[in-house]
Amino acid sequence: MTERYAVFGNPIGHSKSPAIHSMFATETAQSLTYEAILAPIDAFEATFKEFVTNKGYGANVTVPFKEQAFALCDELSEQAKLAGAVNTLSVLADGKIRGDNTDGLGLVADLQRNLGSLTGLKVLLVGAGGAARGSVLPLLQAGIAKLSIVNRTQAKAEILAELFSSYGDVVSLPISHTGKSYDVIINSTSSSLSGEVPNISSDSITSQTVCYDMMYGKEPTSFNVWAKAQGAKQTVDGLGMLVGQAAESFNIWRKVRPSVEPVLTQLRAEL
């Protein structure tokens, strides 16, 4: 029987998830369907439950429903609990709903694909919203030496650093702090969508720094253009993170890990 999967969001028309999972299914010879479902802002839970009733096996969840998805789960992975949000829902054999968060795993996989091992690296995380929160534990588990978090509102960065303090060396700093350089700088904010750049000091970047923007587009993002102008060694956008988190979700559902590279190459060509 062909099993049914979907991505829920609002808006959702722009989603690349159906194309990604269709390519994964072809590559791994899995029989499934994957569609995009527009859920009303005030009716995510009802829309998802209708999907489950109609033989839905699993789903991805995007903006603005990740916290609502978290709330409806019967079981949660450790990563989902700490992220406070769910992007992957699985319908278990007993009908219970399990929630996972694969966003940070997708980020780490893409960083490792571009950099190799992350062990011992000093990382600056810009932003303290949901995307940042979902990334902290996977980064620490990948072996980074220290994670510094900055945010326009420093109190939010402080809360995040405190939440993960028992998992590794995590600190919060003023966004405009100077005198520190990093191996990797990750922009988790959506600043590039409006052509802006976070107010971080250019001396955070050296000729050995890799800068990563979670946003992506046909042209380099505004953050990556700025980082390159400051002399960054390498800039990477978030398209690989998108494909990586999808691969993690696919593996949770199908117990088979698809190859990211061919899908990423095709998506890049289609931007």
Curated annotation (Swiss-Prot):
Please give an example of a GO cellular component term from this record.
cytosol
Give the catalytic activity: shikimate + NADP(+) = 3-dehydroshikimate + NADPH + H(+)
Gene symbol of the encoding locus: aroE
The name under which this protein is listed is Shikimate dehydrogenase (NADP(+))
Oxidoreductase found in the keyword field: yes
User: SUPFAM superfamilies per the record?
Assistant: Aminoacid dehydrogenase-like, N-terminal domain (SSF53223), NAD(P)-binding Rossmann-fold domains (SSF51735)
Q: Does the keyword Amino-acid biosynthesis apply?
A: yes
Active site (record annotation): 66 (proton acceptor)
Organism for this UniProt entry: Shewanella pealeana (strain ATCC 700345 / ANG-SQ1)
For this chain, one GO molecular function annotation is: shikimate 3-dehydrogenase (NADP+) activity
Pathway the protein takes part in: Metabolic intermediate biosynthesis; chorismate biosynthesis; chorismate from D-erythrose 4-phosphate and phosphoenolpyruvate: step 4/7
Q: Which InterPro entries match?
A: Aminoacid_DH-like_N_sf (IPR046346), NAD(P)-bd_dom_sf (IPR036291), SDH_C (IPR041121), Shikimate_DH (IPR011342), Shikimate_DH-bd_N (IPR013708), Shikimate_DH_fam (IPR022893), Shikm_DH/Glu-tRNA_Rdtase (IPR006151)
Top-level taxonomic group:
Bacteria
| Purpose of the protein | Involved in the biosynthesis of the chorismate, which leads to the biosynthesis of aromatic amino acids. Catalyzes the reversible NADPH linked reduction of 3-dehydroshikimate (DHSA) to yield shikimate (SA).
Quaternary structure per UniProt? Homodimer.
Entry similarity comment: Belongs to the shikimate dehydrogenase family.
